[in-house]
């Protein structure tokens, strides 16, 4: 007799095979309208069994102990309820790095890798660059830059001590030396902030409060509000970042900022109108949406 997906009778069955678990979980996730249900089931089971997805299908008839199967059903249940896969796994992949995530930080997005790409281009000719990641969250951008440029001196700040704890744990896990400190983008630039950076990079909160209800529940309910929302003024943090760029970047230094697609032109105009800022550009992500505003400060002129 076929039991309803997720029923007590199903979860109580002893020693199911790997393939049976995947099939049942995929049906359960599909019924809940979760994206990529089969792939999600594979990821969860592979994580639980500490193997890769290919290994699951190399031994599809291998049985799974009842206790492990029950744990798997609980993991699937969390995803059915809408919890992000990365929270269930406890980590996210970003720029080839495995990073811890928790409800204290925003899950790193694949599109933010475009920010890292542009940032690396901006400092490719700079020997031993000094970098500042303002609003680091999980540390994903700072750590990716340090991983790709071991010679860089990377500093990173966040207003949240809980987020900084996650970022520091990620740095320790990866063996990467990034200097973290507490700092509020909208307050005075902290004394601990380096004032001679070759690159300032930031992915600040940029979603207007009015758009909150239009966000997918997996974002609205699980990412911290402070990482998402800019309040009534979607340019609030970019106005602050103008001050940070002015205070922290060396002449000829670069800044790379992730932006809301609908406000990219406004952010570009904001920086174009700032004294001491040179060329400013908007760059699209792989989906063709404006994703980055970047530019350079003016080089010092010989007197």
Swiss-Prot record:
The keyword Kinase does not apply. Disulfide bonds: none annotated. Substrate binds at residues 203-206. Its EC number is 2.1.1.297. It is an enzyme of class 2 (transferase). GO terms for biological process: methylation. One of its GO terms (molecular function) is nucleic acid binding. Methylates the class 1 translation termination release factors RF1/PrfA and RF2/PrfB on the glutamine residue of the universally conserved GGQ motif. Belongs to the protein N5-glutamine methyltransferase family. PrmC subfamily. NCBIfam families: hemK_fam, RF_mod_PrmC. This is Release factor glutamine methyltransferase. It comes from Salinibacter ruber (strain DSM 13855 / M31).
């Amino acid at each position: 007799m076929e039991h309803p997906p997720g029923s007590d009778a199903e979860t109580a069955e002893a020693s199911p095979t790997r393939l049976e678990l995947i099939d049942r979980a995929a049906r359960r996730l599909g019924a809940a309208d979760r994206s990529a249900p089969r792939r999600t089931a594979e990821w969860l089971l592979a994580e639980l069994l500490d193997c890769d997805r290919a290994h699951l299908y190399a031994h599809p008839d291998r049985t799974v102990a009842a206790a492990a199967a029950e744990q798997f059903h609980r993991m699937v249940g969390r995803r059915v309820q809408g919890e992000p896969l990365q929270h269930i796994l406890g980590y996210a992949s970003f720029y080839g790095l495995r990073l811890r995530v928790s409800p204290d930080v925003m899950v790193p997005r694949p599109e933010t890798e475009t920010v890292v790409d542009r940032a690396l281009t901006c400092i490719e000719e700079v020997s031993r660059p000094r970098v500042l990641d303002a609003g680091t969250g999980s540390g994903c951008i700072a750590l990716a830059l340090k991983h790709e440029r071991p010679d860089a001196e990377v500093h990173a700040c966040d207003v949240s001590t809980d987020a900084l704890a996650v970022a520091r744990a990620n740095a320790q896990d990866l063996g990467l030396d990034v200097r973290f400190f507490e700092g509020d983008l909208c307050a005075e630039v902290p004394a601990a902030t380096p004032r001679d950076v070759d690159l300032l990079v930031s992915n600040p909160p940029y979603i207007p409060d009015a758009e909150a209800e239009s966000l997918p529940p997996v974002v609205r309910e699980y990412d911290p509000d402070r990482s998402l929302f800019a309040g009534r003024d979607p340019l609030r943090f970019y106005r602050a970042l103008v001050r940070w760029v002015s205070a922290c970047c060396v002449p000829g230094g670069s800044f790379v900022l992730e932006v809301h697609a609908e406000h990219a032109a406004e952010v570009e105009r904001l920086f174009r109108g700032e004294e001491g800022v040179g060329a400013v550009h908007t760059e699209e992500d792989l989906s063709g949406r404006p994703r980055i505003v970047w530019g350079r400060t003016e080089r010092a002129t010989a007197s």
